[in-house]
Amino acid sequence: MQQERTVKVSKYLSKHLRHQPERIGLTPDEGGWVEIDALVAAAAAHGFPFTRQELDHVVATNDKRRFAVEGTRIRASQGHSIAVDLRLPVATPPPYLYHGTVARHLEAIRAEGLRPMNRHDVHLSPDRETATRVGARRGRPVVLPVDAATMHRDGHVFHVSANGVWLTQHVPSRYLRFPAPH
């Protein structure tokens, strides 16, 4: 499968499993799962046909493991704007997690901390390298270390998704380390 096609199918899956399943007539269960055959049929009926083999390739080769397959069902691993209960267990985070952003967002983050925005949770990376890649999608990256151990000790709840993304509802700014102003 060509890389360009892989990216297109992956983006289509993300859009319709995370955000807009109803646009192609899908109704995920409370955990975000849909039947694979129904997804493939709905995509074809709405002008974006792909095969089960293409879907399997996208799931198997996605470096961020954005999708989970269980038997005959598929869901996005995290990042939903629709209501889902991923049933992720509570987890004890490492001492530090990281958030990738860009400089233009720092003022708002200083004032409000990290908020989920249009998602259900704030997404945190386990290492600086991943956070740098995340921030780079929107410009020159700025990586903010998160004092996850203190947050956890103070009662904040963390979950970790199947693809290693750490999730929490909010990160108050007092747990963030900001870069020195220039």
UniProtKB/Swiss-Prot annotation:
UniProt entry tagged with the keyword Nucleotide-binding: no
Tree of life domain: Bacteria
InterPro entries: Ptrans_KptA/Tpt1, RNA_2'-PTrans_C, RNA_2'-PTrans_KptA, RNA_2'-PTrans_N
Top EC category: transferase
GO function terms (MF aspect): NAD+ poly-ADP-ribosyltransferase activity; tRNA 2'-phosphotransferase activity
EC number: 2.7.1.-
Pfam families from the UniProt entry: PTS_2-RNA (PF01885)
GO biological process: tRNA processing; tRNA splicing, via endonucleolytic cleavage and ligation
Keywords assigned by UniProt, alphabetized: NAD, Transferase
Family membership noted in the UniProt record: Belongs to the KptA/TPT1 family.
Role description: Removes the 2'-phosphate from RNA via an intermediate in which the phosphate is ADP-ribosylated by NAD followed by a presumed transesterification to release the RNA and generate ADP-ribose 1''-2''-cyclic phosphate (APPR>P). May function as an ADP-ribosylase.
Protein name stated in the entry: Probable RNA 2'-phosphotransferase
Underlying gene: kptA
